[in-house]
Amino acid sequence: MDRSKENCISGPVKATAPVGGPKRVLVTQQFPCQNPLPVNSGQAQRVLCPSNSSQRIPLQAQKLVSSHKPVQNQKQKQLQATSVPHPVSRPLNNTQKSKQPLPSAPENNPEEELASKQKNEESKKRQWALEDFEIGRPLGKGKFGNVYLAREKQSKFILALKVLFKAQLEKAGVEHQLRREVEIQSHLRHPNILRLYGYFHDATRVYLILEYAPLGTVYRELQKLSKFDEQRTATYITELANALSYCHSKRVIHRDIKPENLLLGSAGELKIADFGWSVHAPSSRRTTLCGTLDYLPPEMIEGRMHDEKVDLWSLGVLCYEFLVGKPPFEANTYQETYKRISRVEFTFPDFVTEGARDLISRLLKHNPSQRPMLREVLEHPWITANSSKPSNCQNKESASKQS
C-alpha cells in the first residue's frame, strides 16, 4: 500500500523593499474569519500593497507613522522569526461582511495571485462543520460508518454525507485508504464519476461531502431485476468505459469495480464511487493484492505486477454479471474461485448472444497485454449496436488537461 503524501510549504518568506516607494511586506497569515483580527499596539500590521501606491490597512489598525524606515526594520525582525505555512492573500476591509478579497492590485505577479486563490480554497474546506448541514434519512451502512442524505443549510443543496468513525478506521489500519480516496476522488471531474465536494472531521469522526445519487446502487438494481438486458448492459459498459478512460488518462487505476461501487444518478446515469482502493500510478505498476475476490484478475491473485489493465478485466466480469446475474468465476469456496480465475474457467448460458460473448472473452484474457484498449471496447460492434450512450473516449486528451 502506498501512503498518502502530505504537502507543506516550509521556510520563512522574506519581504523585499522596492526602491523609491512604500515598502511591500507580506502578511504572515490569512484572516480565517470574517472580521479582521485585532492588532496589538506594539506590533505593526503587515499588509501587501503595490509599490507605487499607498498602503491599504484595515481601518481599526491604522496609525500614524513618522517615516517608513523604522517600521520596515521592525517588520523585518518579525518576519525573520515567523514561518509562513501557506501562501497568503490580501486582507479584508473591516467593513466587509463577506469573505471576498478586495479588488486586486495590478497583476504583476501571477504566481502570487494563484497562490492566494489556492489558499482561499483550502481555507473554505477547513470551515465546514456538522452544524452546516441538516441530516436526513440513512442511505446506506458500511463497515466503518454510515451514509446519510443531507442538505447544506445556507444553499439548500442536497448531498450525501458519509460519516466514518476514526476508531474503527485506526483499528482496521485503513486510514491510508481514506486519505487516498479523498486525494484522488476530490480531483476527478467526470459525469460518470461521483463528486467529492469536500471533507471535515471532529474528535471522533470523519465526514465526506459527496454527490447524491438518488437511484441508489447498481447492485440493488441488479438484485431487483436478477439480470439486465443487452441494451442496459451495453449502456452501462459504455458509461463505465468512458469514466475509466478519463481515470487512466489521469494515471488513476480504480482496482475495485463492482456493482456495489456503482451508483445511479437522477437520470439513471452510472457513476463510479468508492475510490478507497484506487491509486495514482505514475509507474503504472502495482503489486498490492486488493479489491473484491470475484473481480480480481489473475495477475493480482498470483502476486504479479499489474497496471490499468486490471480495470479491463473487471469490466469483463461486470459485463458478464449484468447479463447473467452472477459473476463468471463464482464458486462455493474462496480456493475454488481463485483456481477458476487463475485458469480463466467460465462458461456462458445459452441466452448470451455471440456479440456479448465475443466482448467478454476478449476482456477476460489471462495475459493483460492481450486485453483490448478501452477505445476498442467502445468501438466493439455489440456495444455500438446496443448502447444508448455515445462514446467520448476520443476526448481523452482534452480530459487529461482538466483540473
Curated annotation (Swiss-Prot):
Q: Which residues carry this modification: Phosphoserine?
A: 41, 51, 342
Q: Which residues carry this modification: Phosphothreonine?
A: 287-288
Q: What is the effect of changing residue 274 to N?
A: Abolishes cilia disassembly and kinase activity
The UniProt entry annotates the active site at 256
**Residues binding ATP, per UniProt:** 143, 162, 211-213, 260-261, 274
Q: Where is the composition biased (Basic and acidic residues)?
A: 114-125
- EC id: 2.7.11.1
Give the main location. cytoplasm
List cellular component terms (GO): axon hillock; basolateral plasma membrane; centriole; centrosome; chromosome passenger complex; ciliary basal body; cytosol; germinal vesicle
Show the Pfam families listed in the entry.
Answer: Pkinase
| UniProt xrefs under SMART domains | S_TKc
User: Can you tell me which residues the record assigns to a coiled coil?
Assistant: none
* Phenotype for residue 174 to M: In a metastatic melanoma sample; somatic mutation; constitutively enhanced kinase activity
Q: What is the recorded post-translational modification?
A: Activated by phosphorylation at Thr-288; this brings about a change in the conformation of the activation segment. Phosphorylation at Thr-288 varies during the cell cycle and is highest during M phase. Autophosphorylated at Thr-288 upon TPX2 binding. Thr-288 can be phosphorylated by several kinases, including PAK and PKA. Protein phosphatase type 1 (PP1) binds AURKA and inhibits its activity by dephosphorylating Thr-288 during mitosis. Phosphorylation at Ser-342 decreases the kinase activity. PPP2CA controls degradation by dephosphorylating Ser-51 at the end of mitosis.
**Which reaction is catalysed here?**
L-seryl-[protein] + ATP = O-phospho-L-seryl-[protein] + ADP + H(+); L-threonyl-[protein] + ATP = O-phospho-L-threonyl-[protein] + ADP + H(+)
Instruction: Provide this UniProt record's keywords sorted from A to Z.
Output: ATP-binding, Cell cycle, Cell division, Cell membrane, Cell projection, Cilium, Cilium biogenesis/degradation, Cytoplasm, Cytoskeleton, Isopeptide bond, Kinase, Membrane, Microtubule, Mitosis, Nucleotide-binding, Phosphoprotein, Proto-oncogene, Serine/threonine-protein kinase, Transferase, Ubl conjugation
**Tissue-wise, where is it found?**
Highly expressed in testis and weakly in skeletal muscle, thymus and spleen. Also highly expressed in colon, ovarian, prostate, neuroblastoma, breast and cervical cancer cell lines.
Q: Where in the cell is it found?
A: Cytoplasm, Cytoskeleton, Microtubule organizing center, Centrosome; Cytoplasm, Cytoskeleton, Spindle pole; Cytoplasm, Cytoskeleton, Microtubule organizing center, Centrosome, Centriole; Cell projection, Neuron projection
Tell me the ranges covered by the Protein kinase domain, including all copies: 133-383
Query: Effect of altering residue 287 to A?
Result: No direct effect on catalytic activity
Bias (Polar residues) occurs at: 27-83, 91-101
Tell me the GO molecular function terms.
ATP binding; histone H3S10 kinase activity; molecular function activator activity; protein heterodimerization activity; protein kinase activity; protein kinase binding; protein serine kinase activity; protein serine/threonine kinase activity
Q: What does this protein do?
A: Mitotic serine/threonine kinase that contributes to the regulation of cell cycle progression. Associates with the centrosome and the spindle microtubules during mitosis and plays a critical role in various mitotic events including the establishment of mitotic spindle, centrosome duplication, centrosome separation as well as maturation, chromosomal alignment, spindle assembly checkpoint, and cytokinesis. Required for normal spindle positioning during mitosis and for the localization of NUMA1 and DCTN1 to the cell cortex during metaphase. Required for initial activation of CDK1 at centrosomes.
Query: Extra info from the record?
Result: Centrosome amplification can occur when the cycles are uncoupled, and this amplification is associated with cancer and with an increase in the levels of chromosomal instability.
Assembly, in brief, is: Part of a complex composed of NEDD9, AURKA and CTTN; within the complex NEDD9 acts as a scaffold protein and is required for complex formation. Identified in a complex with AUNIP and NIN. Interacts with FBXL7. Interacts with CPEB1, JTB, TACC1, TPX2, PPP2CA, as well as with the protein phosphatase type 1 (PP1) isoforms PPP1CA, PPP1CB and PPP1CC. Also interacts with its substrates ARHGEF2, BORA, KIF2A, PARD3, and p53/TP53. Interaction with BORA promotes phosphorylation of PLK1. Interacts with CIMAP3. Interacts with GADD45A, competing with its oligomerization.
Know the name of this protein?
Aurora kinase A
What is the originating organism of this protein? Homo sapiens (Human)
